[in-house]
Amino acid sequence: MTNNQNELGDVMDVLEDNIGYLTDRDREIPETDVAVIKYSAWWEIPVLETEDPLDFLTIGNNQCPASDDWDKLLNAELYDMPRRSQANSESTPPEHTWSGTSELGNYHYSYNDISIGMDAMSMNNRNRDDGFSSSSSSSQTSEGSEWLPEETEFKPKKVVTSEPLSPTPPETETRRLTKVQRRSMTDQEVEQRRKEANKKNSKNYNFNKKSKEAKLKEDLEKNHLYIERATAQEKQTLERIMECYTYFGDGNVLVIHQDAMQNFTEKEVFEEKLEQVDMDVARAREQSQELKSLKKLYQKHRQAYITATNDKALKKSKINTYGSRKSRALHSMNIAELELKKCILQFKIKKFERREKLLEEVENQIKQYFNFKESNHAGYMRLPQERQNRFEELCKTLKTSSPKTSIAGSHRRSTRSSEN
């Protein structure tokens, strides 16, 4: 050993002999509890002094400076050691730990004591990113228990929760058998476990398909409701606009000035724009590849369902299973049909949205002329009393009407909220 450098082997021998240990009290803790080391072996490691003529170093070569709250961190966070035989509902093992495994041992601890780097020889470096993780802790389990590790912080587990749509929610799939568990089971037990797993998978499949059908039916109901409201509002707005056009023209109540004619939509132009909107949407529907694919998919599943229904061997079978060929074909056909109907309704909704936008634009143009300041008094006096009263009602309605909430906008917002 030189004056300024200790032999690496001597340093490692000292560290290995003095790293954290369990007391007799910790070993007496029952299997269901969690053993916790209340103190650290960090203070037990001897300081190997080296010569420092310039007095630059204030600590030994195998020590590192500690912060003021180091003692609190050691006792509070770094020394929880859950046994590997803990139940599934308990907390996950600490990060960057190594777990020794033994089939005959009663105590299995995950030590997270002192992390020693070969280069820096740093202690308890929690921020290192060496990718070290426990591989043996998830491969073996203690006898009579199953310990399922959760996802680490690098791969968060996404949990999607939804209300059950049927009285029997899907059952959680059991974990795979380990080699030790497989060797301890008979062939009959393995076959029984396989049948139970198939039954659970069939129930889960049936539940997922029914959930998807229910979601599509809910979306279709919302789309039908929107179309009903949009149809009623469009009819009312269109009748009001057409009635307003009857008061425009030479010698009539309202006269459009020549300089304002280029910005005003006349009745003939308005009708042409409505027809153009319908033609554009119809053309987009005919050229839609998505709609064509959904039609082919529906025909495919429908033919598969007809084939399964007419299968003589399946008719003679009295077994009623969740995942039978006929049941799968029926669910697939129903889902394909609902998706096709939903796509068709989307084009109708798009047509109503464009027509609603055009109606709102034209009504805003007409609204500014419906007042007595812009009206021709002589033309107004020539009108029958009923028409005069109706003109006054239109003036009040268009003047006092607040900007209405667009049905198309509210429908889009509700659709986005349901998808989220």
Swiss-Prot record:
Coiled coil regions, renumbered to chain: 265-310, 345-374
Basic residues bias: start-end ranges: 410-420
Entry keywords, A to Z: Coiled coil
Compositionally biased intervals (Basic and acidic residues): 184-199
Signal sequence annotation: none
UniProt protein name: Uncharacterized protein T07A5.7
Composition bias, Polar residues: 85-103, 399-408
Keyword Ligase: no
Lyase in keyword set: no
Example GO biological process: protein glycosylation
Stretches for region Disordered: 84-103, 122-211, 399-420
